[in-house]
Amino acid sequence: MSFNVIPAIDLKGGKCVQLVQGVPGTEMVSIDDAVEVAAGWVGQGAKTLHIIDLDGAFSGSRKNAYIMEDIVSKFDVDVQVGGGIRDYETAKYLLSLGIDRVILGTAAIKNPDLVRQLADEFGSETVMVSLDSKQGEVVIEGWTESSGKTTNEMGKFFSEIGAGSILYTNVDVEGLLKGVNEDPVRSLVNSVTIPVIASGGVAKIDDLVKIKNTGAAGVVVGSALYKGLFTLREAIDKVS
């Protein structure tokens, strides 16, 4: 299984944006045509697109759904979507658009039965659980509240109840372009039996190599690509 370098597309108000540490109003990059952005990543060799619906995350609105549908219909790549997916109906709706995988964060932690239900009905491969980790503990509600559980405990639990993969975000380094901390990624990979995708802090191509060496299945890259620190093509060539 080759290591997957996954470009992030954050949607807000129909545009592709990049926020610093997820804070509204801190857009570093805003590009009007998100479908064109997707086309660029696919053109450089992306096999998967990581779409976060910030309007969904901040307000529960699904006004960006038409963009996701457009991306799914135009490109023959895997699409995973997160951002405010808090219930079965929303997840089912997104999967009905042809999205390959829904990413559940706070909702999974507060209601693990949602993970079981979606895995039973649509297959484990459609369910990715997002574990946002701050100093080794999983945080929820947009990083404002600690779950009181370690990342490894949570990872093991979700891998046992039906999640098909885990998205691990190190909140301590997310969006800051300061580099990755590979130790917690390796530790999580060794605690679970399902693929782990890492996210947060990638600033240079060497960071991708570090993540690959942990045994993770892939890495999500956002800020570094949008700031032009390296190209997606260079990244894929380096780790493939």
UniProtKB/Swiss-Prot annotation:
CDD domains: HisA. One of its GO terms (biological process) is L-tryptophan biosynthetic process. InterPro entries: Aldolase_TIM, His_biosynth, HisA_bact_arch, Isoase_HisA-like, Isoase_HisA-like_bact, RibuloseP-bd_barrel. One of its GO terms (molecular function) is 1-(5-phosphoribosyl)-5-[(5-phosphoribosylamino)methylideneamino]imidazole-4-carboxamide isomerase activity. Keywords: Amino-acid biosynthesis, Cytoplasm, Histidine biosynthesis, Isomerase. Pathway: Amino-acid biosynthesis; L-histidine biosynthesis; L-histidine from 5-phospho-alpha-D-ribose 1-diphosphate: step 4/9. SUPFAM superfamilies: Ribulose-phoshate binding barrel. The lineage of its organism: Archaea, Methanobacteriati, Methanobacteriota, Stenosarchaea group, Methanomicrobia. HAMAP family: HisA (MF_01014). It is found in: Cytoplasm. The active site is at 10 (proton acceptor), 132 (proton donor). This is 1-(5-phosphoribosyl)-5-[(5-phosphoribosylamino)methylideneamino] imidazole-4-carboxamide isomerase. It comes from Methanocella arvoryzae (strain DSM 22066 / NBRC 105507 / MRE50). Its EC number is 5.3.1.16. One of its GO terms (cellular component) is cytoplasm. It catalyses: 1-(5-phospho-beta-D-ribosyl)-5-[(5-phospho-beta-D-ribosylamino)methylideneamino]imidazole-4-carboxamide = 5-[(5-phospho-1-deoxy-D-ribulos-1-ylimino)methylamino]-1-(5-phospho-beta-D-ribosyl)imidazole-4-carboxamide. Belongs to the HisA/HisF family.
